[in-house]
Amino acid sequence: MTPRSRITSRPWTSASVPAIDRQTLFTPEFLAQLERLSLASRRVFRGRVKGERRSLRRGHSVEFCDYRPYGIGDDLRYVDWNVYGRLDRLHVKLFLDEEDLCLHLVIDASASMDFGSPTKLDYAVRLAAALGFVGFVNLERVGVGVVRERLSEGWAPARGRSQFGPMVDFLSAIKSEGATRLNEGLAAYALRSREPGLAVIMSDLLDPNGFESGVRSFLERRFDVHLIHLLDPEEMNPDFAGDLRLVDSETGELRELSVDGDAVREYRDRLRQFLERVESFCRAHEIGYHRVITDTPVEEFVLSQLKGLVLA
């Protein structure tokens, strides 16, 4: 028995993914709280267009910050000659410049994400909408990628509050279907992205071939990576027993077995080992790891667990 297996009597289908109404997606109170937040990145990214993100750079801007010794290759226009006259040493002016950040929202939409109420995909979509809203109100660029057996769909990075509605429309049309090949899909998105940024990957990570090499593709391109691991309450604590017929939701493989206390204990032990493996990988590669059970309200998860990590 694996977390990806389903009991055939349960009517989980892609049609169960509810359409998302942009007018009722979030309460005005939650949106007001999101407006006071910004994206938090552990790396500095040089963008094409200035946003509202402040970073320390040498060169021209609106606010002087500090000096540092001149280095080979520095632009002589930013040498402070008055300091040179006093100290007989070359120093370059530093300014607070504006940093442009691109938020990459990467969603696993394979068939295993169509489980639970809400489904894991529905939860990921609402979460992506919340993070995207924060990006838009801060004039950051926000893009979306959808992975299944490969990189299936995408919404090109865009900027501005007016883009929130179109992004929600795109998100609401995503359907969970097909097998999972996370490594291939994630690698394809990382390689196609023109420039790195803050990547938030949302998945249940239920791929027998793993996910690690796909995530490494983002690290190799110098993305700041956060992994949001979605699990349904029933996957954490299965409550079924007896003679069952299980069907793999992605491959269609059928397995009949009797579930007793020993089988449930074995399942929980394997799940624990799986979660420890994921956490260990993320810790070793300095990836932000955030596990969420989908009965946790999206608003609570965003404001209590992501604030101070993905959001500031």
Describe every region a protein language model picked out.
Residues 62, 76, 98, 162, ...:
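Charged, alpha-helix-enriched surfaces in structured cytosolic catalytic cores
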Residues 126, 130, 180-187, 276, ...:
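Short, contiguous clusters of charged residues that form electrostatic/catalytic patches at enzyme active sites
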Residues 2-158, 198-203, 208-209, 213-217, ...:
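An amphipathic, basic-hydrophobic helix/alpha-beta surface used to engage anionic
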Residues 122, 176-183, 269-272:
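Conserved phosphate-coordination/catalytic loops
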Residues 163-197, 209, 231-232, 236:
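Von Willebrand factor
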Residues 155-169, 261, 307-308:
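Short, electropositive alpha-helical surface patch
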Residues 2-56, 191-197, 207-209, 213-312:
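Von Willebrand factor type A / integrin I
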